[in-house]
Amino acid sequence: MKNMMNRKQLWVIVLIAATAMGVALFAVGAKSAPAQQAGVLLSGAVKSDTGAKLEGVTVSAKAEGQTITTSVFTDEDGNYYFPRMAGGKYLVWAQAEGFDAGKSDVSLSGTSGRQDFTLNTLKDSQDIVKQMTGQEYVTALPEDTPQRRKMKDVFYNTCTGCHEPSYILQNRFDEPGWEAILNLMSRVYNGGGEYAGPDMAPFPVMAYYKKELATYLAEARGPGASTMQIKLRPRPRGEAARAIVTEYAVPIADPDANPNDDGFPTNDGTFWSMGTPSALNGSRGLHDTQADHNGNIWFTTSEPNYKRTVSMLDTKTGKVTDIKVPGLNGLAAPTHGLAIDPAGVLWATMIGDPRGGGGNLLRVDPATMKYD
């Protein structure tokens, strides 16, 4: 969600929430939205432990037992305003890079409620970097000498095509540790992520620069003092801070085969201090999204699983309905690209159809949930 903050569009945009296993909608800002009579208006103020008003802080609210999270941003005076919400119990939290998150259980009733936050400044740089985006990690990597600049380019061009830089750099290893990782990754199939075994010829660029790159990474993300120069991105302000973000938590396709929290990923990116989520807890596979003519969100799943080929997310309730197209060996056939035609029919590219072929086209009618 942090990567969305500087977007200035105030109308609805549909996208996958980058590192957070979910789907998000941007909507009109709270101050420009038409007045609503029903529901409770939650507002408050956010300041630092020094008393400074904090602009651009992300404040989020999630109703108890629900899967929908709504987030707004503080204005130039440190104040925030949610659109009116249903009464009930909520978890409300405020986050800004460089600060501990503030969390509170809030019961909303009547016409309005208030929750203020005081955020404590983080003193340890190791705590700060856990909150950083991939872009911020790459920016922080040193390039003050020709050798370091070259190694930064090698890292960016070689190690960030399939996963976020933050997923790699949130960890710290000494030089032998980084070299061991490079030895492994040099024999991993690009794109698929499968280890090809020791007999596969290593990726030439990684093999050639392995020792130099291991030295560079150990200096930046090793056990000793770091060469990184941390510079956090400015928080949103002005029009960008008037956006409202709605996130929908998507359950794991196969929760029995993965660590989970009541069927959801144990870390979905909600709390930045937990670091970048890992696909190892099942939070991967969502690929393309499309909004249908009823305002619901459809998405494809590209990773092998037993129940999900394409899915519909009800944007009013957050409920996810899965459609399984039989694939190979009892699995659901994976899907990749997704488009919608003028008639509202969805089309997806499908892999692993038992009928054979390298790929097939899947058609889904959102009105009937039938496919062919």
PLM regions and their residue ranges:
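Extracellular beta-sheet/turn segments enriched in Thr/Pro/Gly and aliphatic residues
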Residues: P34, L108-Q131
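A short, solvent-exposed loop/turn motif at the edges and junctions
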Residues: G65-T67, K89, W93-D105
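Short Pro-Gly-centered beta-turn/loop motif in secreted/extracellular proteins
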Residues: A52-E55, Y81-K89, E97
